[in-house]
């Protein structure tokens, strides 16, 4: 049985493989504790940059699958969104359907929106959106010291993407 890091990375790799095929997805990056060698993680965080032509419903469904996979191990996952102007716009809504009276932390919750704009809970800084630690699609860009398991699990599956190493990497 893989440890929690590898388990999350494998689930994230499945998400990335499917999300990169969604029309309107411009970039996929890994952020958060998975980009560090921290052994005990609680979640996987991914940042997806989207154009106006994206179907957030498809990405929300993929995000719920990622969260469901993580919950098997009492872990979590967040799929964050940024627009092509480089601004954080929210994260996937955790609910499949929008219901009044359901506890939702979004500011402008609307059926079919699939975007949770709970900026009072979390907001990604523009600097993180502009230069996330690890971009995995459409090209690989690494800006941090790369944990070995990221290289083995995520980057090996993304080999089709061109690589840019912003920092020297010690294999």
Residue ranges and their predicted role:
Residues 1-27, 35-41, 50-171:
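Catalytic core of pol beta-like nucleotidyltransferases
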Residues 47:
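Aromatic/basic-lined ligand-recognition segments
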